[in-house]
């Protein structure tokens, strides 16, 4: 199961339901981790506009508050590649938009 460390601001926004998409820059580190976990070809799925929809199975992940023991669990129902300009990252580069569903804090 993938673990996404988050800053407190983003952790709280996801927890409240205000934020439903987590963004990660399209770099070899995240491409490798995502392609292994979600079983896709990282070299074929690498252009803005590409969409990977989880039709039959939603993948579980953990969203952790920094490097503490506090975390939430969520399901990923879609990953797409978008321009990061209008995202939390605010960069003019391709980014993974990881769509979250069924977010629950684990106590």
Segments and roles (model prediction):
Residues 1-2:
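Short structural boundary motif marking the start of a folded domain
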């Amino acid at each position: 199961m993938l673990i996404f460390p988050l800053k407190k601001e983003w952790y709280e926004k996801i927890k409240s339901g205000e934020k439903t998409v987590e963004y990660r820059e399209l770099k070899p580190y995240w491409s490798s981790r995502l392609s292994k976990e979600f079983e896709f070809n990282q070299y074929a799925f690498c252009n803005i506009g590409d969409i990977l929809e989880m039709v039959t199975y939603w993948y579980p992940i953990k969203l952790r508050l920094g490097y503490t023991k506090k975390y939430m669990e969520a399901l990923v129902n879609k990953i797409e590649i978008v321009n990061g300009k209008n995202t939390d990252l605010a960069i003019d580069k391709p980014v993974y938009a990881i769509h979250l569903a069924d977010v629950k804090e684990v106590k």
